[in-house]
Amino acid sequence: MPNYDASSTNTSKRANVKYKDLDLDFGRNTVTSDVNKLTDVEAVKRSVRNLINTSHFERPFHPEIGSSVRAMLFELMTPLTALNLQRKVQEVLVNYEPRIKLVQIAARPNYDSNAYDLSIYFYIIGSNELINVETFLERLR
């Protein structure tokens, strides 16, 4: 007979896992008057964006979570900087987002806007759909 308690982990390999996160826009659910929840793909997309935009020491009690992507935006725009940006994004996502399997990261310099167009392609674990997250990284003072 299996022993189920709060310290055991789920070793199930089922394909349809439901992911939930809070909506950080803090929109109100009209039925429950609670904060809206993001589910599945939208929750994972929001988490990916948040990890990229989080700097080290920004999260209380978890200073190790974050990336130096924002600091890299103040460097010269060269192909080498774009490659380093891709590596930093890959590092933070591999280390802190276990729900995804990365396929490709593309950072394209936009010289006119002095920013980068960042495209991230990944699969959500347990899903066969290729997800694309595109974001525009620019310097903020």
Regions found by a protein language model. Give the residues of each.
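Immediate N-terminus of the mature polypeptide
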Residues: 1-86, 91, 103, 108-141
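Short secondary-structure junctions
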Residues: 94-102
